[in-house]
Amino acid sequence: VGSEMCIRDRNNSKPTVLVHTSGSTGKPKPLLIEKQRMLNSAKITCDFLGLKQGDKALLCMPLDFIAGKMMVVRGIERGMKIINVKPSGHPLSDEALRSANNDDEITFAAMVPLQVANSLEVPKERERLLAIKHLIIGGGAVDDEMADTLKAFPNAVWSTYGMTETLSHVALRRLSGKDASSWYEPFESVEIATTDDGCLVINAPLVCQAMLTTNDRVE
């Protein structure tokens, strides 16, 4: 039901959607974002990961936040099947997937670190996590222990950097395989700079109208 409401919101005649910022660039506040920029963001991610029509995308994030909304928009933009499960700490449990009537292999999923950590602890859920073709992890830091575990995963696993104002992520860090890295790489359409005191400045015109000065320090 939640994803259907999000789709209706996306398809109504208004050019904008109301979201609330996370506080990365200041005090949390309501923010009107353009639907076209949401589609731009979705296309950037889908193109980068090589997602295609008919892929299966797991929606296990609350739709109150940009991460959940953007999973729906990515599904719309790319023509993916959305597997909608109730947001919980165990999105790959038998109970969660049974409620979604899903037996399909999951192509693409976005999770927070806690969901990944919990899934790693349960053998059946760990097996399902291993089978996800493209997994992005955001909304919190990936600690060294988790990064070491994910490095051995056979498929593509990424940690994301972004915020509500950038309509989810603008940079990715590869966690799995021989290309695993300690550094985040911005998308080609994104430019970064620093302020005099070392804070990150983001210029991502396809997804954000103005340049953003964050509270994050650049190393």
Model-derived features with residue positions:
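Short helix-loop-beta connector
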Residues: 51-55
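Gly/Ser/Thr-rich phosphate-binding loop
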Residues: 121-177
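Conserved ATP-binding loop and adjacent catalytic segment of the adenylate-forming AMP-binding
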Residues: 155-197, 204-210
